[in-house]
Amino acid sequence: MGKFLATLILFFQFCPLILGDYSPSCCTLTVGVSSYHSKPCNPAQPVCSWTLDLLALSADQALQPPCPNLVSYSSYHATYSLYLFPHWIKKPNRNGGGYYSASYSDPCSLKCPYLGCQSWTCPYTGAVSSPYWKFQQDVNFTQEVSHLNINLHFSKCGFSFSLLVDAPGYDPIWFLNTEPSQLPPTAPPLLSHSNLDHILEPSIPWKSKLLTLVQLTLQSTNYTCIVCIDRASLSTWHVLYSPNVSVPSPSSTPLLYPSLALPAPHLTLPFNWTHCFDPQIQAIVSSPCHNSLILPPFSLSPVPTLGSRSRRAVPVAVWLVSALAMGAGVAGRITGSMSLASGKSLLHEVDKDISQLTQAIVKNHKNLLKIAQYAAQNRRGLDLLFWEQGGLCKALQEQCCFLNITNSHVSILQERPPLENRVLTGWGLNWDLGLSQWAREALQTGITLVALLLLVILAGPCILRQLRHLPSRVRYPHYSLINPESSL
């Protein structure tokens, strides 16, 4: 038996190594400034899937475009089908006879060629059927109007791929990076019919930048402030920008109109600026000038200082209120005792009435039984008279009627205990002690007063101490928001 238990323990210790210890993980897809977590996937569950909104992807790519002056997906007047180009597969050169053609050089004449064209030939963008790798084993996708479903094998998580539009003359619009990661506690919200709301949950680099900025702000205030970050819509987001960096003229398409823009000419960040802010139109634009940083609204509040403790005498009002409370309790107890006494007498009278009603019902029941016996005798006599005609019922040509009188309800009524025994009065204790009614009530009142006195002696000091500290707790320090017009 001992050898069996030892073998079983060793098996459970090495079982995770044999079967594989796959912690919950996923594949994170990064587009521009936002990250999208796939459904749970690992080597044991190798399919990583996403459901993406093409308009949201365009907004992500526009905030941090890999190429200047790209035509966004939202600018199209019709829905075109897409091509998915994995970067771990080299495109075949079909020499102009198939899906991809090196002779079609118009898309490659752009200053920023198609993403991945450094190692590939340029893709063909004519009207063709399904792309070559739409149904590959490692990656496949389906497109439903403005929504995209991508399935990726976990072994290929860590590579990048491109999405292009099947329309001549349009630029590539999406460059997707993937990397393995752990599942977040809650998925970032993806709101439909909105271009930028999904970046309310920043990706991991954005969170680290925000924490670094908060750390820098606290250092500048000698850690005497509390930082509060508000979750709000993008219309209330703030922008921190450097007026020393010029914006190219004319500016590109406006992407975001913040509610507040703070210039920071003397602020040195531990990281680079991420976006381009145009002060003339008060908007984030698509130009790659990198002079601003988008932040959720946050406020600085002074840290409250602890006041000195002062010992005070207990106010007279506290003693007065305590005495009034004890007097009210004693008066209430006496009134309750008198009410209980009158209630007991009332129960006794009601019990007598119920007993008399029960006796009357029993007598009526006995009379009913005698009447039933008399009717049965008459029935038997009439049946003998009409014996030749088959009995009384056949002679009258009617259905025979019988009496069914039960004694169960009357017996239950007689067996019920007295009403005084069924209703709890006083404390619910059966203590007669050979005393009269008023003596028992006085004894209960005395025990109640002693219990209240012990409760006041035990809990009184604690209650008085809490009441003494109550005025100091009511006075809260005043918190003021950061001045929007002050320079950082």
UniProtKB/Swiss-Prot annotation:
Segments for region (Fusion peptide): 313-333
PTMs per UniProt: Specific enzymatic cleavages in vivo yield mature proteins. Envelope glycoproteins are synthesized as an inactive precursor that is N-glycosylated and processed likely by host cell furin or by a furin-like protease in the Golgi to yield the mature SU and TM proteins. The cleavage site between SU and TM requires the minimal sequence [KR]-X-[KR]-R. The CXXC motif is highly conserved across a broad range of retroviral envelope proteins. It is thought to participate in the formation of a labile disulfide bond possibly with the CX6CC motif present in the transmembrane protein. Isomerization of the intersubunit disulfide bond to an SU intrachain disulfide bond is thought to occur upon receptor recognition in order to allow membrane fusion.
UniProt cross-references to Gene3D superfamilies, sorted A to Z: 1.10.287.210
Motif range (CX6CC): 393-401
Regions of this protein lying in the Extracellular compartment: 21-442
A Pfam family per the record: TLV_coat
Transmembrane segments: 443-463
Lipid-modified residues, S-palmitoyl cysteine kind: 462
Keyword Secreted: no
One GO CC term, this protein: host cell plasma membrane
GO biological process: fusion of virus membrane with host plasma membrane; symbiont entry into host cell; virion attachment to host cell
Signal peptide as annotated in the record: 1-20
Site feature location: Cleavage: 312-313
Positions annotated with a glycan in the UniProt record: 140, 222, 244, 272, 404
Positions of the UniProt region annotated as Immunosuppression: 376-392
Domain-level remarks: The 17 amino acids long immunosuppressive region is present in many retroviral envelope proteins. Synthetic peptides derived from this relatively conserved sequence inhibit immune function in vitro and in vivo.
Function: The surface protein (SU) attaches the virus to the host cell by binding to its receptor. This interaction triggers the refolding of the transmembrane protein (TM) and is thought to activate its fusogenic potential by unmasking its fusion peptide. Fusion occurs at the host cell plasma membrane. The transmembrane protein (TM) acts as a class I viral fusion protein. Under the current model, the protein has at least 3 conformational states: pre-fusion native state, pre-hairpin intermediate state, and post-fusion hairpin state. During viral and target cell membrane fusion, the coiled coil regions (heptad repeats) assume a trimer-of-hairpins structure, positioning the fusion peptide in close proximity to the C-terminal region of the ectodomain. The formation of this structure appears to drive apposition and subsequent fusion of viral and target cell membranes.
Note: HTLV-1 lineages are divided in four clades, A (Cosmopolitan), B (Central African group), C (Melanesian group) and D (New Central African group).
The protein's name in its UniProt record: Envelope glycoprotein gp62
UniProt source species: Human T-cell leukemia virus 1 (isolate Caribbea HS-35 subtype A)
